[in-house]
């Protein structure tokens, strides 16, 4: 939160993967900041299509007391432990000496175990230079070391977020460097069940991809957002890059009823 304040942001979204564990700590930190910062509570929900394509859905301002959504997030978190063990087994089979204990050192209390922690372990072991390199070389969706985990279908994930009063945004839908992306017909199906927006302005989208996604969003009646996808010092993304316009945010905010933006 302090980094967001120092970057001059008015609003920042907290969307850890498949968890709301950081909400209270983040909200409590606002009063000590040098500037007035609004906190948008949410989660980045891991989903998977029937064609086994990984999809990330940003759920914002939902009611975390909603039982069905909370259980779906818990199911995904629980499956990440055996998944991590299998990824490590595959890496070690290729001669890459990393252990589960190495990964655990990079997982904060309450955090959702995931590939970023494995990436940080590879950096600490000097196997790669940074987290982005770890994903490029070993951890992307097309890698032989990649292992999937239990995830809701994106259609169901959107329905869960909307039923909990939240906003549903399809994250980095054209980030081909991460792996196969859903096609326009799949996005149209998501729009039919309540998807609010496409995250168009993102570091992983070139100008041609952004133009294509803007056209698709207009055709489907979806709003257009931007995001830094900031993950801390381990990732090259700058906090505050690729922002969402005030006009778009105000329209999204008007659709949410699960929880409110938090101010100190």
For each feature predicted by the language model, list its residue ranges.
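An N-terminally biased module of ancient metal coordination in phosphate/nucleic-acid-related enzymes
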Residues: 1-52, 139-140, 152, 158-159, ...
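Mid-domain alpha/beta scaffold segments of enzyme catalytic cores
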Residues: 17-82, 86-107, 112-117
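Active-site gating loops and adjacent loop-to-helix segments of metal-dependent hydrolytic enzymes
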Residues: 48-81, 120, 124-143, 240-262
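Short hydrophobic/aromatic-rich motifs at helix boundaries and adjacent loops
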Residues: 59-61, 92, 128-130, 158, ...
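Short coil/turn linker and secondary-structure boundary residues
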Residues: 64, 98, 113, 152, ...
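Conserved acidic, metal-coordinating active-site core of Asp-based
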Residues: 108-175
